Design a protein with these regions (language model features):
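N-terminal accessory/pre-domain segments preceding catalytic cores
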Residues: 1-64, 68, 156
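Aromatic side chains
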Residues: 2, 15, 34, 71-73, ...
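Short regulatory "switch" loops immediately downstream of catalytic or recognition motifs
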Residues: 10, 82, 132
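Secondary-structure boundary elements
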Residues: 35-102, 113-115
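Active-site-proximal helix/loop microenvironment
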Residues: 105
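Hydrophobic/aromatic-rich core segments of domains that either
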Residues: 109-159
Length: 159
């Protein structure tokens, strides 16, 4: 089941819910939504993240080894940006390539980059971000930028 909500701009960056609908959807392949870019995990065939993902994949023995290489790449090459974390505005959208270029990021940047690296190499990866990242609603009880990965050998795992 999907939830589709339509919001109307009230003033500045404030929105009001004007329509909500639950949709029952049957997917031919349950993994398809977790293989493609979206606004939080943007990449194209020319992205730095895709090129880095390919390089890491070429050095991997299997999909689980690739996941480990991606994890180590991200934690060893991206430094946590405390100032950004303290000043990030509601509605922030991460950019995996910009995170790679700057070498810094917040939890959402780490998760978005990891998801882009994995999805670009056909590893189904789900990125969950709390509502607080994109609205003034309280955050649900999950870790900011939770990443769920599905591998052939281990099934769904959490980073």
């Amino acid at each position: 089941t999907y939830q589709a909500d339509l919001y109307e701009n009230v003033t500045d960056d404030k929105y009001a819910l004007i329509y909500s609908q639950s949709l029952n959807v049957t997917l031919k392949d349950e993994f398809q939504p977790y293989l493609y870019p979206n606004q939080y995990v943007w990449f194209t065939k020319d992205s730095k993240a895709v090129k880095k993902g390919q390089a890491l994949s070429d050095d991997s023995a299997d999909d689980l080894d690739y996941v480990q290489q991606v994890y180590h790449y991200v934690i060893e090459n991206i430094t946590y940006d405390k100032q950004k974390a303290e000043t990030v505005a509601s509605g922030y959208i991460p950019d995996p390539d910009a995170t790679m270029e700057s070498g810094t990021g917040i939890c959402f940047d780490y998760a978005s980059l990891m998801t882009a690296l994995l999805r670009s190499q056909h590893i189904p990866t789900k990125l969950e971000c709390p509502a607080s990242w994109w609205s003034d609603m309280p955050a649900p009880p999950i870790t900011p930028g939770s990443v769920y990965i599905c591998t052939r050998s281990a099934g769904w795992i959490t980073s």
